[in-house]
Curated annotation (Swiss-Prot):
This is UPF0235 protein YggU. The gene is yggU. GO terms for cellular component: cytoplasm. It holds the Pfam family DUF167. SMART domains: DUF167. SUPFAM superfamilies: YggU-like. The lineage of its organism: Bacteria, Pseudomonadati, Pseudomonadota, Gammaproteobacteria, Enterobacterales. It comes from Escherichia coli O157:H7. Disulfide bonds: none annotated.
């Protein structure tokens, strides 16, 4: 499975998360996943909620349209973005 998969209702992203980074950013490809750096620490779900908020801004969707499908407690996650309004260039480059 590739890092980015296009479905009828949106995108599925396989992510590798780097918490406690100096800034929020989509870093690029990391193995077969997209690496995302976020500033929030991995404590009490702070990193997950920060990730959902960050991806919502990047794809211009509501937070409710960013769904963590797998990996709630780990660095490796599968995220679904429902009907993205925009696709960041770092992700667009990975779509086959």
């Amino acid at each position: 499975m590739s890092a980015v998969t296009v479905n009828d209702d949106g995108l599925v992203l396989r992510l590798y998360i780097q918490p406690k980074a100096s800034r929020d950013s989509i870093v690029g490809l990391h193995g077969d996943e997209v690496k995302v750096a976020i500033t929030a620490p991995p404590v009490d779900g702070q990193a997950n909620s920060h990730l959902v908020k960050f991806l919502g801004k990047q794809f211009r969707v509501a937070k409710s349209q960013v769904v963590i499908e797998k990996g709630e407690l780990g660095r490796h996650k599968q995220i679904k973005i429902i009907n993205p309004q925009q696709i960041p260039p770092e992700v667009a480059a990975l779509i086959n």
